[in-house]
Amino acid sequence: MAETDSSHTRGPVDSIQKNDASSDDAEAETKIQYPSGWRVTMILTSVTLAYFLFFLDLAVLSTATPAITSQFDSLVDVGWYGGAYQLGSAAFQPLTGKIYSQFSIKQWTFLVFFIVFELGSVLCAAARNSPMFIVGRVIAGVGSAGMSNGAVTTISAVLPTQKQALFMGLNMGMGQLGLATGPIIGGAFTTNVSWREDAPADDDAGFYINLPLGAVVGGFLLFNTIPEPKPKAPPLQILGTAIRSLDLPGFMLICPAVVMFLLGLQFGGNEHPWDSSVVIGLIVGGGATFGVFLVHQWWRGDEAMVPFALLKHKVIWSAAMTMFFSLSSVLVADFYIAIYFQAIRDDSPLMSGGAISAVGYGLLSTLSPTTSVAKWVGYQILYGVASGCTTAAPYVAIQNLVPAPQIPQAMAIIIFWQNIGAAISLIAANAIFSNSLRDQLAQRASQITVSPGAIVAAGVRSIRDLVSGSALAAVLEAYAEAIDRVMYLGIAVSVMVIVFSPGLGWKDIRKTKDLQALTSDGAQGEATEKETVPVALG
């Protein structure tokens, strides 16, 4: 990359445009006193457990959702049970990058966000109706915004660059373990205990399960020191300046933009027709507000929540779009395969959880009430392997591209779009499912003795309480057809992962001494080291 004019005043993110800056980063890294021994072990264990809980929470919910819809008579809210979580996370994600850049990683950020996440889980466990449960999911999502960003920021702070890729892979592996075991754990509690604490027995276990591990995470973080990428003054000393630098006006624009757009998708075809003024107004209003947000971010320059200078780099926007579609593909399948097994196959939540421990789409769109066990197991294993291949590379790319002080903001961009993608896809999948189910039930009205509205309102686990015999067979066919149409959405988002992932590039970081010298135009340091881990970068 060509050098910029020396008279140009460089902003805080311009350093990633200069290869000579990487040598300064390397020198600074050698001066950092990284924790070692039991201290680094405790810190990394807490980060790994936090990632495990983050993904476990998502996976437990996917299996418990059919039982929740029956408890609250709220099948039309399925999209919001997952989407509300992603909405809370996405709305706060850009702000977390600014917070981590201003305040201590441990004392004022990671722990606070983790506590918020745990409080959201407690509220979900205590929920007595669908709106209360959705509010709990939003609060948990807000906490997860800081957890996901903080985990990556912490790894960058406690490990030298050449070790970060390896541990990031291990960390993501634990996250995938949470996705794999979550459906089984959630199914076991839903089957044998119930999904929350409103029954006489141990009904709290489903959503309280992360509290014991959460106490371990909090304890490990509380009694250890995490080195900062750059010195930070005491919180009270910089509070006024820090608040001004958080770009709260930008936050007040992105929040309503996301909420309006997702509400429009949720209301369309459910509470209001798609061509109603309410739906059109929400979607258009959300888009217009997002446009104002982009203008505001451009005007703020390097002080914005989402600095445009970072978005100029191919690796960053490629990673953002890859994760936008990647998490979407996983969550859509998690939620609707659970409905397939519990509604159509009449499996218990435990059996359903075991079935969705891996996920798949192109072949899954062929599922029917008579699909053999060998097929649905094979389909899911195939996609489970594929989805795992896309997990770690975008995060490792960002860690090796961006100077340490800017990693929180870069990660905030990636995770923001990841969560926006998940929220939009879940709400869109819910719209496709609910509208398709109503259409399919209407087509089979002569075979069904109960109104389509009553079937939709009853929830997944209550179908067999309403209909039986030939009417039940017709209802199950309608469910299967609606789920197949949701899987077509999964095919589309999976293809988009293929479209954007090549933007991560194919650079071998084993041959690069100063990893942060890698930039979007292909600049690369001299080949001097051979002992680090390879990763696709751009």
Swiss-Prot record:
Subcellular location, principal: membrane
Biotechnology: Asperfuranone provides anti-proliferative activity in human non-small cell lung cancer cells.
A Pfam family of this chain: MFS_1
One MF term in the entry's GO annotations: transmembrane transporter activity
Gene Ontology biological process terms, A to Z: transmembrane transport
Recorded topology in the membrane: Multi-pass membrane protein
Alphabetized SUPFAM superfamilies for the sequence: MFS general substrate transporter (SSF103473)
Key words, A-Z: Glycoprotein, Membrane, Transmembrane, Transmembrane helix, Transport
Region (Disordered) residue spans: 1-28
Induction context: Expression is regulated by the asperfuranone cluster transcription factor afoA.
Subcellular location: Membrane
Disruption phenotype: Strongly diminishes production of asperfuranone.
Residues the record marks as carrying a glycan: 192
Keyword match Transmembrane: yes
Keyword Transport: yes
Chain ranges passing through the membrane: 40-60, 107-127, 138-158, 165-185, 206-226, 248-268, 278-298, 321-341, 378-398, 413-433, 486-506
GO CC terms: plasma membrane
Protein purpose: Efflux pump; part of the gene cluster that mediates the biosynthesis of asperfuranone, a probable antitumor agent.
Family note: Belongs to the major facilitator superfamily.
Protein name: Efflux pump afoB
Species annotation: Emericella nidulans (strain FGSC A4 / ATCC 38163 / CBS 112.46 / NRRL 194 / M139)
Gene: afoB
